[in-house]
Amino acid sequence: MVPVAYYLVLSAILFSIGVGAFLIKRNIITIFMSIELMLNAVNLSFVAFANYWRQINHQFSGQIFVFFVMVVAAAEAAVGLAIIIALFRSRSTLNVDQVDLMKL
């Protein structure tokens, strides 16, 4: 059985990659994907903790919480992609520096 610490280290690495890409990249799609990577890193840590606590308490609350986070992430992805498509149609670019103003 793989120790929980390995999953937490992997989750921290994925979250760090997501934060780094969020801070460095200027493309809206890349920023959006880095936010999704951070959400999935948090989901991985929730599942790891749920598996660890399931061995002790025999409860599945962590997996249920991950399911709700995935539902919210799917809704966020749909709304985010719709906003990105609308920005691309109006500005013809996906560069954050060029679409930072909320005007036509």
UniProtKB/Swiss-Prot annotation:
GO cellular component: NADH dehydrogenase complex; plasma membrane
Top class in the EC scheme: translocase
Gene Ontology MF annotations: NADH:ubiquinone reductase (non-electrogenic) activity; quinone binding
Annotated keywords: Cell inner membrane, Cell membrane, Membrane, NAD, Quinone, Translocase, Transmembrane, Transmembrane helix, Transport, Ubiquinone
Domain of life, per lineage: Bacteria
Catalytic reaction list: a quinone + NADH + 5 H(+)(in) = a quinol + NAD(+) + 4 H(+)(out)
Record keyword Ion transport present: no
Location within or outside the cell: Cell inner membrane
Enzyme Commission number(s) from the entry: 7.1.1.-
Annotated GO biological process: ATP synthesis coupled electron transport
Transmembrane regions listed in the UniProt entry: 4-24, 28-48, 64-84
UniProt KW NAD keyword: yes
Topological relation to the membrane, as annotated: Multi-pass membrane protein
Subunit structure, interactors included: NDH-1 is composed of 14 different subunits. Subunits NuoA, H, J, K, L, M, N constitute the membrane sector of the complex.
The protein's name: NADH-quinone oxidoreductase subunit K
Organism this protein belongs to: Acidobacterium capsulatum (strain ATCC 51196 / DSM 11244 / BCRC 80197 / JCM 7670 / NBRC 15755 / NCIMB 13165 / 161)
